Amino acid sequence: MSEELWQRCLTRLEDELPSQQFNMWIRPLQVAASADGAELTLFAPNRFVVDWVRDKYLDRISEVLGEMQSGPLPQLRLEVGSTRASTPAASYFNGSSSSSSNGPITTPAAAPAPRQPESDSRPQPTSLGGARKHRSNLNTGFTFSTFVEGKSNRMAAAAAQQVAENPASHGYNPLLLYGGVGLGKTHLMHAVGNELLRRNPNAKVVYLHSERFVADMISALRNKTINEFKRFYRSVDALLIDDIQFFAGKEQSQEEFFHTFNALLENGQQIILTCDKFPKEVDGLEERLKSRFGWGLSQPMEPPELETRVAILKKKAEEAKVDLPNDAAFFIAQRIRSNVRELEGALRRVIAHVRFTGAQIDIGLIKEALKDLIALQARQISIDNIQRIVAEYYKIKINDLLSPRRTRSVARPRQVAMALSKELTSHSLPEIGENFGGRDHTTVLHACRKVLELRESNPEIEEDYLNLLRTLTS
């Protein structure tokens, strides 16, 4: 009876919660009821999930169960564990063979020797002729410890950690990370692969760019080694494929990947994918692939917010053994907003300027080193542009944003536009207020605080804000 109660509870929670929250935190929970139905134990895959669910969702779970139960409510427990006889992670990556013809090969190749980080993480061409040696192609510099977490990427990082600790677990296979360039998708993908190999050096983990998969398939067809191609890609413990948008329009490659995808999932092998946008928005991808990509967890990665950009700069400066003052880090972060790659590029220019001139890092030096980038950013994002984009997004007129109207349909977009102006431009609060119909700085400050509060409590406002941020910085 308690298990039936839990299924009804799941249905309610799925309706209430945003899909990414439900799929990430609630769906992976497994339930076990005591013989007398007096106790209901929820099993989470690791301690991180236990702590998160207890902090964010357990009270609501208890409320829903109470609303649905006519009699005494079973005692609710939350623990790390599984209802299955063995933990999935113990069998997915132990190098064992499978009875299926599409399953893992009987002898996995040894993990490659550690390599130093490379400037280009894409693998070099490999031959499919003869016995193919397993090479992970992982960048050993991309780990969880070198990844800077912030609000914009915290959910994606947590999902990646989950996969690294519990590969091929329910609700996380495949794991798909999507977003614009330079936001850390590839870093997280490599971090999972490196952690899987750290936990089990015999795991067969393979990273490659989607174009490499296509090139290997073409080579296999030309050399009549397509069966070996299939055996190799279907024998891995974890397959990590970057930039799947490049499969678009390549029908034969999509056909082969479709069958590889199915074989891996059927045999409990982990798949991790990245894409530059939500796959359903990619023209030229077959609908059946788009559907399968949604079987697991799809997690967006957004441009980093100011605090995360500062943290990234400080960490990279520390790695380069350069002292970056806080005011200098904030100055750079306020002006380079689009992605991590551009942020790191700006810091490299500053460091090069320091080493060439022998000067100390200060605001003046940064202005000189980044003068063309700063000028470009200033031209790209203006308050006028923000007002235009926000008005189009909310389907109102720009004059409405400048008017004294206080109806919610106008006031809320105006507050969002003010908050974006503060985050994306170097204008002061009084200057922003002046551009919004002559309002004073206290109105702008209130708008910024209100939007921050709403983003934390209202998923719809958070989605609107991030959509606008992505549009303005892309």
Swiss-Prot record:
Spell out the subcellular localization from the entry. Answer: Cytoplasm
Region (Domain II) residue ranges read: 91-136
Q: Does the keyword DNA-binding apply?
A: yes
Locate the compositionally biased regions of type Low complexity.
Answer: 96-113
Report the InterPro entries cross-referenced here. Answer: AAA+_ATPase, Chromosome_initiator_DnaA, Chromosome_initiator_DnaA-like, Chromosome_initiator_DnaA_CS, DnaA_C, DnaA_dom, DnaA_N_dom, DnaA_N_sf
**Could you name the domain of life of the organism this protein comes from?**
Bacteria
Q: Where is this region: Domain IV, binds dsDNA?
A: 355-474
> Which keywords annotate this record?
ATP-binding, Cytoplasm, DNA replication, DNA-binding, Lipid-binding, Nucleotide-binding
Segments carrying the region annotation (Domain III, AAA+ region) are 137-354
Binding of ATP: at which residues? Answer: G182, G184, K185, T186
Q: Which GO terms describe its cellular component?
A: cytoplasm; plasma membrane
Matches recorded under NCBIfam families: DnaA
Subunit relationships? Oligomerizes as a right-handed, spiral filament on DNA at oriC.
Protein family (similarity comment): Belongs to the DnaA family.
What does the protein in this record do?
Plays an essential role in the initiation and regulation of chromosomal replication. ATP-DnaA binds to the origin of replication (oriC) to initiate formation of the DNA replication initiation complex once per cell cycle. Binds the DnaA box (a 9 base pair repeat at the origin) and separates the double-stranded (ds)DNA. Forms a right-handed helical filament on oriC DNA; dsDNA binds to the exterior of the filament while single-stranded (ss)DNA is stabiized in the filament's interior.
**Name of the molecule in the record:** Chromosomal replication initiator protein DnaA
- Species the sequence originates in: Alcanivorax borkumensis (strain ATCC 700651 / DSM 11573 / NCIMB 13689 / SK2)
